[in-house]
């Protein structure tokens, strides 16, 4: 690679292998090792720091992605995390590792849900869009801002409402929705909301189809709504109700 610097500005070209990045203030995983990394970056510091990522392509055992974007630091009397315009494409991703690579700007609710809900599976055809003043994330009511992550999840096991995310501690309170398995679904984060739309899946031995699970606002008091079609033994239907919050 190469780096050029002059008068408070510069550019960098990277084409490397087996690279470790320190990203403690960027993503949840503080050290990310990449088998392949290519990037074209420009920056300037006047009147405030601006970083333009013209292109980045990275891959390791967990993930393969491409992205581009602009970051502007807050300036003058303003303070805060700054402004970001980021567009990304996820080529492949090991689902349980997803939380490690999502920007911290996505917020603790989103990151915690990803860490505990995606038990297994793989992500394909993913896209990510973040645009706006990061101090106002996830941009509820912000017409000129955007946060949206969409992806296809296949062969997945999903804990749609993990107790640890809800702050539930007692054994009784930890009774949550049964694990959904063998899922092929579309996953969407849109601002503060999360929606899972599954064409197929299973709970116990019951087969599920046309399932939609939605959390309107991620956070410690999130409410989950689920509807869909289930086919299977009556005993499994009763068990599902009795071991989920439906029985409360």
Located regions from the model:
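Membrane-proximal interfacial segments on either side of biological membranes
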Residues: 1-52, 63-203, 207-248
């Amino acid at each position: 690679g190469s780096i050029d610097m002059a008068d408070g500005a510069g550019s960098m070209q990277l084409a490397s292998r087996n690279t470790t990045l320190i990203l403690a203030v960027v993503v949840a995983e503080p050290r990310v090792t990449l088998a392949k990394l290519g990037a074209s970056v420009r920056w300037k510091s006047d009147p405030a720091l601006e970083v333009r990522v013209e292109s980045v392509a990275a891959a390791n055992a967990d993930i393969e992605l491409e992205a581009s974007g602009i970051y502007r630091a807050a300036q003058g009397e303003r303070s805060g995390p700054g402004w970001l315009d980021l567009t990304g494409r996820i080529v492949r991703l090991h689902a349980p590792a997803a939380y490690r690579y999502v920007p911290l700007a996505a917020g603790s609710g989103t990151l915690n849900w990803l860490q505990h809900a995606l038990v297994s599976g793989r992500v394909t055809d993913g896209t990510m869009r973040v645009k706006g003043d990061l101090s106002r994330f996830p941009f509820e009511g912000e017409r000129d801002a955007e946060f949206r992550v969409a992806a296809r999840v296949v062969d997945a096991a999903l804990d749609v409402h993990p107790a640890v995310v809800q702050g539930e501690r007692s054994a009784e309170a930890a009774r949550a929705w049964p694990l959904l398995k063998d899922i092929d679904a579309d996953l969407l984060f849109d601002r503060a909301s999360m929606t899972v739309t599954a064409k197929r899946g299973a709970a116990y031995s019951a087969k599920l189809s046309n399932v939609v699970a939605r959390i309107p606002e991620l956070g410690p008091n999130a409410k989950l709504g689920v509807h869909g079609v289930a086919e299977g033994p009556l005993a499994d239907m009763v068990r599902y109700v009795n071991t989920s919050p439906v029985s409360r």
